[in-house]
């Protein structure tokens, strides 16, 4: 069904803009891939709306023609407040411009009936399994914007890259199994060396969104305090994941990485070649600078430097980094890289004996917000929260 829909869109070429409305796993994954593989995208413009802040949706309305824009409403539960509120605003905007909802909006959800009740035709609803967590869902219909953008041939290569890494994870012996080795390193740093954070620095601007995606992947999966049996963990699980694109990060927080008292294990991600699709005179030289900087930072973190006269110039070294490298940014290689990080998270969770596929920690805040919004009742709130609400 998804394939036929995407083929139909591509053949008719009616839409100049594709807008994905979703949050969390319904946004971060597709957005990250869009940025990573933009050079391969066939659709002129794919945009993403996640926050309920009206600023973003207003920008969409200014930029887009309602008759030439497809909106993908992505919510597994079809009850996500931010997503549905943005979808309501879009539906009103389309109606104002005499555009029928089902001509310009589709729904991606695991609860088909809710989407039907909302007003979507059955042909405009694309279901995902209720068992697939949002942060692992970009391979499903949640990745519709990826499929539309890449086109069928490149989308298949993207999926094949992920499958290749998954099969490596499942079949390879432990001593040569890349996700398991990196998961063991993560646990070694987290639990034995007490390093509570892990930095990811991609030396390619295409992967500037990967640290934020990896942050959700690891911290929502493994940010737990009890194991699968409900017993309190004896050691902490997920490290804090953070990062930024290199070389920008070198002029930002690398001072902390090199000389701060807190040691941060770091993944340095770098393709060995510039993307052949965007070759221009000087591109190879610029890319060589990226490679050199990536290697130099890993070397400096490892070896350090001693200045006996000026202690401010001392670099202690012994700071762990892992260089993860591939040929160039293609649908296949990016698919492999994404699956690599997924499998690191899964393997780590297995070794910590926790459930990496639930996320109850996100529910309490939503429950309280819904209670305040629906019941207008603040009697159970703290004095500070009541005071803040009364200032509205």
Predicted features and spans:
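Substrate-recognition/cap regions that form aromatic- and gly/pro-loop-enriched pockets
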Residues: 258-261, 270-330, 334
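Conserved beta-strand elements of the Class I
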Residues: 17-21, 70, 106, 199
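Glycine-rich phosphate/diphosphate-binding loops that line cofactor/substrate pockets in enzymes
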Residues: 1-16, 60-69, 185-196, 257-262
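Extended, hydrophobic alpha-helical segments in both membrane/secreted and soluble proteins
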Residues: 29, 57, 73-76, 80-94, ...
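Extended, charge-enriched "interface" segments that sit outside catalytic cores
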Residues: 1-12, 283-303, 326, 348, ...
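A glycine- and small-aliphatic-rich helix-loop capping segment at beta-alpha/alpha-beta transitions
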Residues: 28-43, 63-65, 88-95, 119-125
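Glycine-rich oxoanion-binding loops at beta->alpha junctions
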Residues: 1-9, 33-34, 39-70
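Active-site phosphate/pyrophosphate-binding segments
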Residues: 93-278, 317, 364-370, 377-392
């Amino acid at each position: 069904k998804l394939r036929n829909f995407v083929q139909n869109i591509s053949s008719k070429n009616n839409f100049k803009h594709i807008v994905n409305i979703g949050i969390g796993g319904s946004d971060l994954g597709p957005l990250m891939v869009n940025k990573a593989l933009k050079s391969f995208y066939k659709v002129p413009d794919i945009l993403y709306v996640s926050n309920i802040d009206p600023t973003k949706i207003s920008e969409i309305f200014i930029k887009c023609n309602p008759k030439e824009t497809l909106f993908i409403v992505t919510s597994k539960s079809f009850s996500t407040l931010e997503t549905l509120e943005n979808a309501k605003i879009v539906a009103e905007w389309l109606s104002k411009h005499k555009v029928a909802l089902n001509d310009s909006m589709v729904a991606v959800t695991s609860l088909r009936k809710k989407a039907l009740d909302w007003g979507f035709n059955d042909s405009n609803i694309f279901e995902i399994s209720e068992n697939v967590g949002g942060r692992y869902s970009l391979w499903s219909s949640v990745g519709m914007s990826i499929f539309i953008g890449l086109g069928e041939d490149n989308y298949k290569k993207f999926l094949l890259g992920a499958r290749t890494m998954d099969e490596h994870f499942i079949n390879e012996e432990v001593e040569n199994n890349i996700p398991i080795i990196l998961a063991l390193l993560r646990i070694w740093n987290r639990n034995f060396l007490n390093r509570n954070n892990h930095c990811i620095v991609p030396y390619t601007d295409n992967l500037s969104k990967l640290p934020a995606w990896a942050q959700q992947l690891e911290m929502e999966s493994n940010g737990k305090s009890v194991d699968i049996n409900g017993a309190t963990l004896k050691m902490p699980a997920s490290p804090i994941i953070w990062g930024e694109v290199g070389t920008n990060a070198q002029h930002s927080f690398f001072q902390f990485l090199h000389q701060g008292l807190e040691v941060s294990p770091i993944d340095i991600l770098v393709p060995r070649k510039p993307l052949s699709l965007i070759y221009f005179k000087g591109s190879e030289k610029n890319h060589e600078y990226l490679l050199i900087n990536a290697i130099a930072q890993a070397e400096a973190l490892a070896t350090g430097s001693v200045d006996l006269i000026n202690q401010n110039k001392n670099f202690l070294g012994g700071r762990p980094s892992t260089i993860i490298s591939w040929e160039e940014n293609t649908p296949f290689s990016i698919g492999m890289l994404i699956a690599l990080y997924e499998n690191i998270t899964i393997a780590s969770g297995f070794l910590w004996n926790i459930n990496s596929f639930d996320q109850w920690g996100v529910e309490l805040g939503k429950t309280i917000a819904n209670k305040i919004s629906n019941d207008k009742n603040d009697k159970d709130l703290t004095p500070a929260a009541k005071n803040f609400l009364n200032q509205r």
